[in-house]
Swiss-Prot record:
It catalyses: tRNA(Lys) + L-lysine + ATP = L-lysyl-tRNA(Lys) + AMP + diphosphate. Its EC number is 6.1.1.6. A motif ('KMSKS' region) lies at residues 276-280. It is found in: Cytoplasm. The keyword Ribosomal protein does not apply. Pfam families: tRNA-synt_1f. It is an enzyme of class 6 (ligase). This is Lysine--tRNA ligase. GO terms for molecular function: ATP binding; lysine-tRNA ligase activity; tRNA binding. InterPro entries: aa-tRNA-synth_I_codon-bd_sub2, aa-tRNA-synth_I_CS, aa_tRNA-synth_I_cd-bd_sf, Lys-tRNA-ligase, Lys-tRNA-ligase_SC_fold, Rossmann-like_a/b/a_fold. The lineage of its organism: Archaea, Methanobacteriati, Methanobacteriota, Stenosarchaea group, Methanomicrobia. CDD domains: LysRS_core_class_I. It comes from Methanosarcina barkeri (strain Fusaro / DSM 804). It comes from the Archaea.
């Protein structure tokens, strides 16, 4: 795999076999929280757009918010009062929180902000505006005139019978506002109007511009024609035999006289053991919530590293740490120009990065330690970051990473990742062996005599205790009044964790120790080496 061409570049090369301007399009209906499963579509489109641009192609990238789609049902996250709005376009019903222009904007606004944070900047189209400004009017006329030809294509490709009163256009009732309960009874091409009757009992006339919308299987190919879409990713449900892409291919060619876009079919993102993400089933982590936990470049990496046709398993708990480790290791290899890094891996890193994304040098796991040692106090976090050898110049990015860690610890961190530094020597220190006490006292004296000590140096210093003749081994021997004691470093690390946390294990010791003021460690280890319950009574 190391020297394999990245999938985005393979797609770009295929697309460029056709000359001319290219338009990469993506579209999502903002009917609920837009989750990281949806995000796969947009990140995939962005990667291909960047690959095309890197090859000098004349290409643009757009995102279409399908906000003129109807509300299908009262979703679990909605109050029952929304039952009256089922069937209405989501751009025409109230915002759930009351702070946005409409229902669609309530979910669209955080999604567009998430795109910005991910370094994704497509031109944004809103379907309701496209319909209302007449962008679809000619396509609507064509579809109404060629209704029978479209119905024949739908039946031949999907294998389903089209109702005799079916129309490719769904008028919006002037009375109840719904587009799912109307039937077309006639149309006037010159006046650009459509006659309808509605199940609510009302009948009337609506303009083609904004008075309704094309049904999905006609809307999609009409969009390709109207906008000139040449590349589009979409979920595997649309790519099934007889599905909307199959019908769309024929409709766009035979009805609208345009070629279908290059298809990029993607698999689902599976959430832990809960299955594919879906807004309607509630198996979802919104992209906004996810960006409060995971650095943007890591979220891009999750999608960029995997071919679209393969499903992605995502778990925000312990596996998230493994994912972040992988990305940070790749970043280090890339920056150090590691000769073992292949073409594919280099490209994965390049496409995972984006302008405007924070690029913190601090490892996520290390910030997990720093944050908890500092008890979440940002001023203390900055002190520890500086003491750990990192620059504190970009406070915005440090704060962003600290906030990610804070939310992760609160919502998803497994118990072993959490700890609390005890304000006093923990009572568990009473169980320390004579060797462990001697080590703590010797270790305290040794680090007190030295200057600044890095995390790696702390780690190696503890391990040096097992080496006969090492300074730490000699000091332990002096404390025990013996010669070259046999030392198991694992017991020494336990002594450290018992002294600070009151538990036998904890975070990576080097990072952990380097997060503290040296004076605090010296005092704590000396106290722990002499601790007894009687003295505390």
């Amino acid at each position: 795999m190391a020297d394999t061409i990245h999938w985005a570049d393979v797609i770009a090369e295929d697309v460029l076999k056709k000359s001319g301007k290219h338009l990469v399009a993506t579209g999502i209906t903002p009917s609920g929280n837009i989750h990281i499963g949806n995000m796969r579509e947009v990140v995939t489109a962005d990667a291909v757009y960047r690959a095309l641009s890197n090859k000098g192609a004349n290409a643009d990238f757009i995102y279409i918010a399908d906000n003129y789609d109807p509300l299908r049902k009262v979703y679990p996250f909605l109050p029952e009062s929304y039952v009256e709005h089922v069937g209405k376009p989501i751009s025409e019903i109230p915002c759930p929180c009351g702070n946005c222009a409409n229902y669609a904007e309530h979910f669209l606004k955080p999604f567009l902000e998430a795109l910005r944070r991910l370094g994704i900047n497509p031109q944004v189209y809103r379907a309701d505006e496209m319909y209302k400004t007449g962008k679809y009017t000619e396509a609507i006329k064509t579809a109404l005139v060629k209704r029978d030809a479209i119905a024949k294509i739908l039946e031949e490709v999907s294998g389903k019978t089209v109702a005799a009163d079916w129309s490719p256009f769904n008028p919006r009732c002037n009375q109840c506002g719904k587009i799912t309960t109307t039937k077309v009874t006639g149309f006037d091409l010159e006046a650009e109007t459509v006659d309808y009757v509605c199940a609510c009992g009302h009948s009337g006339i609506v303009p083609m511009a904004g008075g309704g919308k094309l049904t999905w299987r006609v809307d999609w190919p009409a969009r390709w024609s109207v906008l000139g879409v040449t590349v589009e990713p979409f979920g595997k449900d649309h790519a099934s035999k007889g599905g909307s892409y199959d019908t769309g291919k024929r409709i766009v060619r035979e009805i609208f006289g345009h070629e279908p876009p290059y298809p990029i079919v993607y698999e689902w993102i599976m959430l832990g053991k809960q299955g594919a993400m879906s807004s309607s089933t509630g198996v979802v982590i919104s992209i906004s919530d996810m960006l409060e936990i995971i650095p943007p470049e890591v979220l891009r990496y999750l999608i960029i590293r995997t071919k679209p046709e393969k499903h992605i398993q995502f778990d925000p708990g312990q596996p998230l740490l493994t994912l972040v480790d992988e990305y940070e290791r790749l970043r280090t290899q890339f920056r150090e120009n590691d000769p073992s890094l292949g073409t594919f891996q280099k490209r994965v890193y390049e496409l995972s990065r984006a302008t405007g994304i924070c690029q913190s040098e601090i490892p996520f796991k290390q910030m997990v330690t720093i944050y908890q040692v500092a008890r979440g106090d940002f001023a203390q976090i900055l002190k520890i970051v500086k003491r750990s050898g990192f620059s504190t110049e970009d406070k915005k990015c440090i704060k962003e990473l600290a906030d990610n860690v804070s939310k992760w610890l609160k919502l998803y961190a497994p118990p072993f990742a959490k700890f609390k530094v005890k304000e006093k020597v923990p009572v568990q220190a009473a169980t320390l062996s004579e060797l462990q006490r001697a080590f703590l006292s010797a270790f305290a004296a040794l680090i007190e005599s030295r200057g600044e000590i890095s995390g790696e140096e702390y780690h190696m210093l503890v391990y040096s205790a097992k080496d006969e003749g090492s300074e730490l081994n000699r000091k332990i021997a002096e404390k025990l009044n013996t010669h070259a004691p046999q030392v198991d470093p694992r017991e020494l690390f336990k002594a450290i964790y018992f002294s600070l946390l009151g538990q036998k294990s904890g975070p990576k010791a080097g990072w952990f120790l380097s997060s503290f003021d040296k004076e605090f460690l010296v005092e704590r280890f000396e106290e722990a080496s002499n601790y007894s319950p009687e003295k505390q009574a």
